[in-house]
């Protein structure tokens, strides 16, 4: 696979999978707007979306915040899934149908013309190759994992540590059948377009990538080395996270996510989750000051982990109810 092809894959995945494992990076994801400025798209009608297979039991959790004239539903997504994963539910369908506005992390995530330049600008730096940042032992371990996934340390040497980490983190799941096209975000965005709903992004691809790329080099290297050390367990961790999410086990899904963020380095937790959650909470609070019904679909880690959007809304006096 060529480096250009891998960059194209990165653009697709970074914009969808930013918070969950990059965490999400996803990471995860332009306008001349200040960080946190929302981007809205009046969704053009699209072909009718394929029905979502029904989850067993209650399915993934859904929350709601209400006042006299405003309703905001909060649904935690998984950015990549195996095709055919059964995650649908009547409660999510009803909430989605009732909303006039759909909010996702990044509304322009499918626009390669937007995402690719962002990745190239903030994810590639030939003047400071990985081989000059990592120790000899670290680079050798990285090269071994890269080769096991069809690349090499030399081919990825110009990548900044955060992007190299992301490539490692996604190679295993991709080989195991996970696809961003089957992810919840893509599915719900397609449905929004099919139904002519207004589609909004909490951030732009440029903002999302800048937040991750802006982590300290120390944190980026820790992030990369973590995925190299645990390469054999990446798919198992994602499988377990998806299983917990499908059962509605928010606590377990949050715990598993922390393995890839806060447990590695606090800077990762802050960049991937805390700072973004605070900005999104501000935007949701603004929605509550208006009127109408909105459906928010963001990476599950933003709703299920510590320092979550739900925690922040609760701290501001909002009653967040799980349905």
Where are these regions (language model features)?
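Bacterial N-terminal signal peptides that target proteins for export
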Residues: 3-25
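Short glycine/proline-enriched coil/turn segments at helix->beta-strand junctions
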Residues: 23, 70, 98, 290-292
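Residue-level signal for alpha-helical transmembrane segments in multi-pass membrane proteins
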Residues: 25-29, 33, 107
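Signal peptide processing junction and immediate N-terminal pro/mature segment
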Residues: 30-46
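Structured, acidic catalytic/metal-binding patches in enzyme active sites
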Residues: 50-53, 61-272
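Extracellular/periplasmic catalytic domains that process cell-envelope and extracellular macromolecules
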Residues: 56, 66, 288-290
């Amino acid at each position: 696979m060529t480096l250009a092809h891998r960059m194209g894959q990165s653009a697709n995945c970074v914009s969808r999978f930013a918070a969950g494992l990059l965490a999400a990076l996803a990471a995860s994801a332009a306008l001349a707007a200040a960080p946190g400025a929302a981007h809205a798209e009046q969704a053009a009608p699209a072909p009718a979306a394929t029905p979502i297979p029904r989850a067993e039991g209650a399915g993934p959790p859904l929350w709601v915040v209400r006042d006299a004239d405003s309703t905001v539903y909060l649904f935690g997504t998984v950015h990549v899934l195996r095709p055919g994963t059964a995650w649908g539910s009547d409660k999510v369908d009803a909430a989605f149908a009732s909303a006039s506005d759909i909010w996702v992390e990044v509304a322009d995530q499918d626009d390669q013309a937007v995402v690719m330049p962002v990745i190239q600008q903030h994810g590639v730096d030939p003047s400071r190759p990985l081989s000059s940042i990592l120790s000899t032992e670290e680079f050798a371990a990285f090269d071994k994992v890269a080769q096991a996934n069809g690349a090499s340390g030399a081919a990825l040497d110009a990548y900044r540590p955060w992007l190299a980490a992301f490539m490692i983190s996604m190679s295993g799941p991709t080989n195991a059948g996970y696809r961003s096209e089957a992810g919840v975000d893509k599915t719900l965005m397609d449905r929004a377009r099919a139904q002519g709903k207004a589609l909004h992004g909490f951030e732009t691809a440029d903002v999302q990538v800048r937040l991750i790329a802006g982590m300290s080099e120390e944190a980026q290297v820790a992030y990369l080395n973590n995925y190299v050390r645990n390469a054999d367990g990446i798919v198992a961790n994602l499988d377990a996270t998806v299983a917990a999410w499908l059962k509605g086990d928010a606590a377990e899904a949050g715990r598993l996510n922390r393995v890839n963020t806060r447990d590695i380095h606090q800077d990762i937790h802050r960049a991937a989750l805390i700072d973004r959650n605070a900005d999104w909470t501000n935007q949701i609070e603004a929605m509550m000051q208006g009127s109408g019904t909105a459906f928010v679909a963001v990476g599950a880690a933003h709703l299920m982990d510590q320092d979550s959007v739900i925690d922040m809304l609760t701290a501001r006096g909002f009653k967040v109810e799980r349905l």
